Amino acid sequence: MELCYENVNGSCIKSSYSPWPRAILYAVLGLGALLAVFGNLLVITAILHFKQLHTPTNFLVASLACADFLVGVTVMPFSTVRSVEGCWYFGDTYCKFHTCFDTSFCFASLFHLCCISIDRYVAVTDPLTYPTKFTISVSGVCIALSWFFSVTYSFSIFYTGANEEGIEELVVALTCVGGCQAPLNQNWVLLCFLLFFLPTVVMVFLYGRIFLVAKQQARKIEGSANQPQASSESYKERVARRERKAAKTLGIAMAAFLVSWLPYIIDAVIDAYMNFITPAYVYEILVWCVYYNSAMNPLIYAFFYPWFRKAIKLIVSGKVFRADSSRTNLFSEEAGAG
């Protein structure tokens, strides 16, 4: 039996993986961190550099990418070592910060997705007046509130140790030298569940409404297309089609987030009421499903957004350093804006 810290009383037990499984785990988990960092960096760079992408929705997407980027930089590399080795080698202080960063950035992602669902609902249901309702200023307020609430919640619980109130004996029993755990007591886990559940209900309801409206609009356009005078698509129809496409892509991003998060949240609630009975390997799988979500959004954008693929080519090829590259037209006529 190998310990995290030899010759130290109360040391955690180190994982007993043989070399090949250990190398595979490092490769798989490390790949997730690299995708989260460089994929989201591409999203941020594209939106901030190309003036055509300076829209309220895209600023929300850029801030969401920033949260996922920070997960890839400050959380995933350290969690990779902890998950593979079974040990925390980065000190008690950074253990607290790691937990705070983890929770802050993940909840920031959730709140951003909720704001994006509101933005898409307004855009699809009322595309012509949308630009006057959801402005860049409104987007900025949404971004500020998303970051404020997520950071305040996380640091007020985990940095102060409030998460351990009432379960001190259990925490002592679970604690060993070389570990980094942050169990939530029953009160805080319920708040955590509500912070996840309420935005989720809002998102599911709004995207449900979006797709109902989109279906009605599609039928209306099909009906008007059969009329002789409808030889060309009207401006309103083009705008509606563009907004539906954006809503569909961002709806997929929301669905991916919920699928990644839901098992972890359910397990966290069960654990708090069952004295943390979840086996370590199950917990690690659930945590990494959440982490890997930070790498998924750039892949979703690359698959569904032609403008993002074009932006990637310009960034990777270095053409963004050319004069006036920020004014490059990323959209084809038929694609419309993202």
UniProtKB/Swiss-Prot annotation:
Query: Which keywords are on file for this protein?
Result: Cell membrane, Disulfide bond, G-protein coupled receptor, Glycoprotein, Membrane, Receptor, Transducer, Transmembrane, Transmembrane helix
Recorded topology in the membrane: Multi-pass membrane protein
Question: Where does the entry say this protein is expressed, by tissue?
Answer: Mainly expressed in neurons of the olfactory epithelium. Also expressed in the intestine.
Q: Which GO terms describe its cellular component?
A: plasma membrane
What is one GO biological process annotated to this record?
A: adenylate cyclase-activating G protein-coupled receptor signaling pathway
Q: Which residues bind spermidine?
A: 102-103
Q: List the disulfide bonds.
A: 12-176, 95-180
Compartments it resides in: Cell membrane
Q: Name one Pfam family in it.
A: 7tm_1
Q: Which residues lie on this side of the membrane: Cytoplasmic?
A: 49-58, 119-138, 209-246, 305-338
Under the heading SMART domains, the entry gives: 7TM_GPCR_Srsx
The transmembrane segments are: 24-48, 59-80, 96-118, 139-160, 187-208, 247-270, 284-304
Entry superkingdom: Eukaryota
What is the role of the protein in this entry?
A: Olfactory receptor specific for trace amines, such as triethylamine, N-methylpiperidine, N,N-dimethylcyclohexylamine (DMCHA), beta-phenylethylamine (beta-PEA), cadaverine (CAD) and polyamines such as spermidine. Trace amine compounds are enriched in animal body fluids and act on trace amine-associated receptors (TAARs) to elicit both intraspecific and interspecific innate behaviors. Trace amine-binding causes a conformation change that triggers signaling via G(s)-class of G alpha proteins (GNAL or GNAS).
What protein family does this chain belong to? Belongs to the G-protein coupled receptor 1 family.
Q: What is this protein called?
A: Trace amine-associated receptor 9
Native source species:
Rattus norvegicus
What broad taxonomic lineage does this protein's source fall under?
Answer: Eukaryota, Metazoa, Chordata, Craniata, Vertebrata
What gene is this protein a product of? Answer: Taar9
